[in-house]
Amino acid sequence: MSVLFVNGSPNPHGNTAALAAALLKGRKYEILHLTDYTLGSYGQQLPGDGLDAVIAAMKAADTIVVGSPVYWHNLCGSVRNVLDRFYGRVENGGLSGRRLYFVFQGAAPEKWMLEAGEYTMKRFAALYGMTYGGMATNRAEAEKLNQTL
């Protein structure tokens, strides 16, 4: 089983990565840092666009963990750009057979912020045919989800 952690945080060794490490403890996994890729907004075609590489890495994985810090009450921009740009580029069901987990952390997110982020990830999973495994917002939740991998 191949596992990919898609890190949306601009800090490759920050709290989002630490939460993913807790979720993935004891497992081998690859890390894709979105900050290493040129990823414009939906509708943009930038030189050196990295979306195809991100999509290919996600298609190659059996289990995908998307990580985002809570910025402005929601997903960070890099994760949002990837989700937005999947639309029309990846067919519905295009990630069938894969499992998706979500790590989402911030200084003091309110319940509605976490619910909004998870709603988005559940919809993303459903649209592209993935089984949604759950969300971890703290170490205890990550350790519990680890048992389901």
Regions found by a protein language model. Give the residues of each.
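Short hydrophobic segments within beta-strands
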Residues: 6, 103-105
